[in-house]
Structure formats: structure tokens, C-alpha cells
Amino acid sequence: MAKAETVSKARERIRAWRRDPVQFARDCFGVEPDAWQVDAMRSLGGDPNPARRLVMKACTGPGKSATLARMGWHRLACFAGKGEHPKGAALSITADNLKDNLWAELAKWQARSPFLTEAFQWTKERIYAKEHPETWFLSARSFAKDADSESIGRALSGLHSQYPFILLDETGDMPTAVGRAAAQIFTGSPADAAIIQAGNPTSTSGLLYESCMTAAHQWTVITITADPNDPKRTPRVSKEHAQEMIDTYGRDNPWVMATILGLFPPGGFNSLFGADEVDAAMKRFYRDDQLGNAAVILGGDVARQGDDSSAVCKRRGRQAYPIRTLRIPDTTLVAQQFVQEKARHDADAF
């Protein structure tokens, strides 16, 4: 009877943890989550949700990988049913980055929990339940730098479960195709599924930007900031240092926006022009007499591998023209198209 009561109490506690990830973190890891961590974790609790999407857009140094690791343990420990076990995949911008950051954090936080240490086995490529090693796991995944969407899809395959989840770290520069591949976990009518990602807002062309801006209506977006004026700022970044950087460079400085405020710079972290500036240039129109004898210049971008298209663009003086895309896998044929474009426009240079 004593053993049955113990099992019953354990099940009750896990059910409570499933609904309250914040309490799970307190009980298992002995930590008091920061204000932004509470907001993020609460989005992963409550009633069952077959399509959870959480994105954490972070300044530098707030502990986002540690938070992502705790969320991973919450999914592993608390989401299971009779004959149904959680299956997860973890992915970062590179295999080495995953190994050195998120995967190391998973090991660190497991070591702080006697419950997780007893129930799960951590290895370099896989974390699994000791009693169900084949069906209850979180595996480390990776993809080649030049991988196309099909290859990325294979990197995130094999998560057939009622409780699938995917952890994505450093998504600032991660290809948007990763997001589309990850969303496959929602297609099997799961009981509760989650994609959880975190990254720094250094690029306006990666998965993080797409999730926070273009597809923000699909995601719970948490902005993690070191802004001294924000009551929910991370306490893990010195307020004095943050204020000094703001005073020195200004709030609209791209570096300050990305690394201190947790915001996307208008032109990206390392971009000469922002997307808004390019769009504005494309919408301008000049008459021929305003362009005078301006040279006709063509520019080309060859998509040698991956899921992108090649492109060719015409410019005459200050006038930019619509970009023509070419979905041609053979680079020799792309070169022939470029030659034909130069002749068609009587271009002065390519």
C-alpha cells in the first residue's frame, strides 16, 4: 500500500508540474525564475495544446540556453500518457554550438535534480528515459551548412508521438526552412506538441526574424532585454554596463539594439541597408529625362545549393527594377541566362 501511495503522489506531482512549468523549475532545480522566464514558461503549461510555439528573442547574456534546457526537461519529465511517450529533437546553428551550449546546459540542470538523474540517462547524442530508452527521448540533431529544405526535414524526422517537441537554439541566423520542417510535428494530431526556440536578433533574414515579425501571429513572442528602464529586464546583465552602452552609442545603434535591448536593428546587425530601405528604393520611379545618361548595371546572385533561387536585378542610376528569380539547378544554364539578360537590357556592366 505504501508503494502504491508513493506512486500515486508522484503522478499527482507530475500532473501539477505539467500545468505549471514554473513550479517544476523551482522544485526540480531549486531556482527562482526571472520575470521574463516566468512569462515564457507559463506559455508552456496549462491546458493541453497541440500546437505550442514559443520564441524567445534575447539580448546577450540573459540565460536563454539555460531556460531552453529547463523547458526541455519539463517536456521530457511531464508529458507522457499510457503507451505514449515524449519524443524530442534539439538543434542549433551548428553541431558544435549545440554540444557546447544547449546540450551542456541539459547535463548541468539534470545534475541538480535527483529525480531527473534517477529517471533519465544523458549521453553525448541522446537523453532517454532509463525504463523506455527507445521511445522516450530527446536527441541531438544537426544539418549541413549548405543543406536544402529536404535535408533539413530529414534532420527533424522521427518524432512520431502524441507528445513531440523541438528545441531550437541560436535561431537568429538559422534558415527559415528549419521552422517549416519543425512544424511537421503538428500534422499528426498530437495531444500536446511544442516548438521552442531562442536566439539573438542579429539578422533580419533568419528564422528568429520570421517568427517574431512575419509570422508573429503564430507564436508567443518573449522579448528578453537588459534595458535599465524595463521592469522585466534580465538581472543577469549589469544595469550599469547596459546604461553605459546606451549612453555611449545611443538606443538606435544596431549593436545596442541587438545585444542590449533585444530588438532587431532596422537593417540587421551587419547589413549596409535594411529591408525597409530596400523596399523604398524598389518603389521609387524616375523618368528617362531624370536618369540622363546613367549606366545600366545588372547584378546577379547565384544559388549554387540549398533551397534558394538565383536572381538577377537591373539598375539604372538611382532607379532599381523588379528582381527576376531563376529556379535553375544547373549553374552553367544560369550563366547563359545572365549573358542573355545583359544583351536584352544592353547593359553597360554586369
PLM-predicted stretches and their roles:
Residues T325-R327:
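Short, solvent-exposed loop/turn segments at secondary-structure boundaries
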Residues P329-T331:
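Short coil/turn segments at the loop-to-beta-strand junctions that recur within blades
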Residues M1-G300, V312-P322, L333, Q340, ...:
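Phosphate/NTP-binding elements of NTP-utilizing enzymes
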